């Protein structure tokens, strides 16, 4: 059905009734927009949905995802991941007990035991729920939220019910914006 996608595996079965492939051992899905590597994967041809268990890695243009159980819609590039799930967006790592992800809207959310690590700004934010908006470089963290900023040889801790991490892009004012 999709000539751009190639699936490889050491073992595979096709279930005609469900339009479903079940692959085991060294599963690889290659597509110009993403790459998936898994130990065990079910692929539904009509919906292009994948369900996987065991160590799985999904690589897109600007993200890497790792989990040990989850679902990924290859057509819409969105998914739900559990068990040791992580999303790596450039210099930011999102970890949590469960993660949702949508590449088209550049949005991710994390639930339970979440950790957002920003290696560029040397910041770690923890909590029990987070929403991450990659396109505007911001995040909202609630429920037991704490931010840790590493400053030279020290750390700054900030605790709140809800934390917002927002990157504001600075543009210099034009001469006509000057107030006299």
Where are these regions (language model features)?
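Single conserved hydrophobic/aromatic residue that forms the stacking wall/gate
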Residues: 170-173, 177-180
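Structural signature for solvent-exposed beta-strand/loop edge elements and short helix-capping sites
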Residues: 1-172
């Amino acid at each position: 059905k999709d000539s751009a996608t190639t699936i490889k595996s050491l073992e595979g079965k096709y279930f005609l009734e469900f339009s479903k492939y079940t692959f085991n051992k060294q599963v690889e899905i290659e597509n110009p927009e993403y790459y998936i590597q898994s130990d065990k994967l079910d692929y539904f041809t009509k919906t292009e949905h994948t369900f996987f268990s065991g160590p799985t890695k999904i690589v897109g243009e600007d993200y890497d995802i790792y989990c040990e159980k989850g679902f990924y819609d290859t057509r819409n590039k969105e998914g739900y991941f559990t068990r040791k799930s992580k999303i790596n967006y450039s210099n930011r790592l999102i970890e949590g007990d469960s993660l949702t992800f949508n590449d088209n809207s550049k949005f991710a959310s994390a639930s339970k035991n979440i950790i957002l690590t920003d290696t560029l700004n040397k910041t770690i934010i923890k909590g029990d729920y987070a929403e991450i908006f990659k396109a505007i470089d911001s995040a909202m963290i609630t429920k037991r939220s704490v931010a840790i900023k590493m400053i030279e040889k020290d750390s700054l801790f900030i605790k709140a019910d809800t934390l917002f991490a927002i990157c504001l892009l600075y543009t210099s004012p034009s001469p006509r914006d000057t107030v006299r």
